[in-house]
């Protein structure tokens, strides 16, 4: 039976594009792990995707994951079938434009083949303590880039 893991993620950018950071909480039973990272020049969406990728990549075996994010971009791409359509359409949007962040989407796809992940949208900057902690981690990571 797969381990059940809960992950909260958030990405932030000071300017968009600009210096960015991401934060994640991984929870398994009574264990909670906090991770974060940054990039000197990036976008908010790249940090949102990066947070999910980095968190999932830390899992040492296939897991059943509930991943919570305040990123509509990330959650809708998965839950509304955008990601599947983009792949079928040679990474073109419905408007026939190139999908942004293909490199990160491809990394995420590989991880989604390993783990069974359910994506959940949470309201950002509200009363969700886990999401707020991820936001704090992301913002602290940005400070380390300057």
Swiss-Prot record:
Residues 1-143 form the RNase H type-1 domain. It comes from the Bacteria. The keyword Ribosomal protein does not apply. GO terms for biological process: DNA replication, removal of RNA primer. Endonuclease that specifically degrades the RNA of RNA-DNA hybrids. It catalyses: Endonucleolytic cleavage to 5'-phosphomonoester. It is found in: Cytoplasm. Mg(2+) 2 binds at residues 10, 135. PANTHER family: RIBONUCLEASE H1. The lineage of its organism: Bacteria, Pseudomonadati, Chlorobiota, Chlorobiia, Chlorobiales. GO terms for molecular function: magnesium ion binding; nucleic acid binding; RNA-DNA hybrid ribonuclease activity. This is Ribonuclease H. SUPFAM superfamilies: Ribonuclease H-like (SSF53098). CDD domains: RNase_HI_prokaryote_like (cd09278). Binds 1 Mg(2+) ion per subunit. May bind a second metal ion at a regulatory site, or after substrate binding. It comes from Chlorobium chlorochromatii (strain CaD3). Monomer. Mg(2+) 1 binds at residues 10, 48, 70. One of its GO terms (cellular component) is cytoplasm. It holds the Pfam family RNase_H. Belongs to the RNase H family. Keywords: Cytoplasm, Endonuclease, Hydrolase, Magnesium, Metal-binding, Nuclease. Its EC number is 3.1.26.4. Its cofactor is Mg(2+).
């Amino acid at each position: 039976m797969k381990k059940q893991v809960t992950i909260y993620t958030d990405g932030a950018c000071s300017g968009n594009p600009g210096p960015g950071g991401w934060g994640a909480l991984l929870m398994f039973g009574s264990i909670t792990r906090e991770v974060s990272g940054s990039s000197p020049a990036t976008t908010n969406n790249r940090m949102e995707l990066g947070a999910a990728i980095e968190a999932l990549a830390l899992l040492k075996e296939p897991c059943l994951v509930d991943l919570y994010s305040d990123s509509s971009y990330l959650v809708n791409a998965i839950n509304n079938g955008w990601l599947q359509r983009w792949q079928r359409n040679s990474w073109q949007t419905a408007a026939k434009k190139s999908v942004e962040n293909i490199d990160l989407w491809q990394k995420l796809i590989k991880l989604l083949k390993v783990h069974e992940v359910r994506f959940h949208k949470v309201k950002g900057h509200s009363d969700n303590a886990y999401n707020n902690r991820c936001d704090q981690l992301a913002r602290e990571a940005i400070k380390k880039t300057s």
